[in-house]
Amino acid sequence: MKITLVNSRLDPAGVTIREQIQVLLADPEYQREGIDWEFLEIDGRLIHQERIDTGLNSDLLIFLSRHTSRRPVPVLTVHPTGNPGEALLGGEAGSFAPAAPGWMQAVLQNLVRLVPDGYQASYEVTHHGPTTLSTPSFFVEIGSTDHEWSDPVAGAAVAEAVLTAAPVDPISLIGFGGTHYAPRETAVALETRGAFGHILHSREIGGLTGSLLAKIATAAEAEAVYIDRKAIDRPALDHLYALLEETDLPVLGEKELHQIGSLSWQEYRSLRQIAGDAAPGAHLVIGTLPGGGTPVTATVPADLLAQAISADQGRVMTAIGRMPVVGLTGRGGLLLPIIITYERYRSQIIHDLITLCVKTIREEQHAVIDGDRLIIKKERFDPGLAASLGVPPGALFGMLKGGQAVRVGDQVIKPEMVRSCTVTAIHLRGLERYT
């Protein structure tokens, strides 16, 4: 792989980073098999270097640059180039350069690990040129004043972050929403496999069009979308969702990105599709499902699962998390009686889930077995009975519900006087196998 490191003689931060990279490359420890580092120093501003990759035959361009800000803070950043709107700082309006999401994520993760005291590290949203490139690229920057631009410690941190970057199975995303330093996207990239190709500031969402979205998706090599919903106003958010409905890009939340684990994106998307067909709108709860298998659905008796969740939802969900399955949750986060697993596990998983439910019910509730029937008896505080005995709603209800006797006038009302009993029978053929 050939990587070209581009800096400008006019840019003190770029010069600092380049010098520190050259120092590190003199050490054999930083020589990496399969990577050929090439330096390219120019005289002009980096943001105006359209088509600079012509004839380079590089696989990746990394622009070494200074960062400026109206509110200068010591910062190390990475970002792709492009102009969602006007081209105020190089490039073309409504144009986006090919991104390198995995490499940007890897460099960002290293920057956070190596960041000097007093500095911060983050993404920046997509902005400025150059945009007319055919080679994937990104900027890595030191900000935001002369002091930081010439700081050899900051330069060394960036140099090591670049030279040791190693993308690991990233999921390429477009990020929508947030401020200039993209705090949520930064957190996602640090904590999950989500790697952003392009990121749009909240103010750009309202002006987004379908054709612009298509350009961004292509330049970002996007597999999915992440939205910082809290950072986008409702009209712009509705506009964005309407545009996304015309694409095949799934929207992934932070929780979902955390759950994907080591599953390949293709495997995860297949599971997501199966879940959508089986229970539209359901959310996935991924257990210990390994990669490689034929995914199938399986069901457990809905009434049995409901009783087990009522008895101890935490126990059931913890067990699901330890099984090679994908659980599905509906409204309110309740587990649905449909699970996804691999075909080779299906029979055993059904047996294990039914056994889990039966044991949970028997251990947490008053339940007995009668042949193929699991009979569950529940006693509950009955507010109707309490009211019929003259107990006013409020604190006395709470005391009775908690097992305390109360006095109403001359009468003592005991908890057992205001309880009603329900009996539920669940039929399970071969129930003895699950006890």
Curated annotation (Swiss-Prot):
Binds 2 Zn(2+) ions per subunit. It comes from the Archaea. It catalyses: a D-aminoacyl-tRNA + H2O = a tRNA + a D-alpha-amino acid + H(+); glycyl-tRNA(Ala) + H2O = tRNA(Ala) + glycine + H(+). It holds the Pfam family tRNA_deacylase. SUPFAM superfamilies: AF0625-like. It is an enzyme of class 3 (hydrolase). Keywords: Hydrolase, Metal-binding, Zinc. The keyword Ligase does not apply. GO terms for biological process: D-amino acid catabolic process. Coiled coil: none annotated. GO terms for molecular function: D-aminoacyl-tRNA deacylase activity; zinc ion binding. Its cofactor is Zn(2+). D-aminoacyl-tRNA deacylase with broad substrate specificity. By recycling D-aminoacyl-tRNA to D-amino acids and free tRNA molecules, this enzyme counteracts the toxicity associated with the formation of D-aminoacyl-tRNA entities in vivo. Monomer. This is D-aminoacyl-tRNA deacylase. The gene is dtdA.
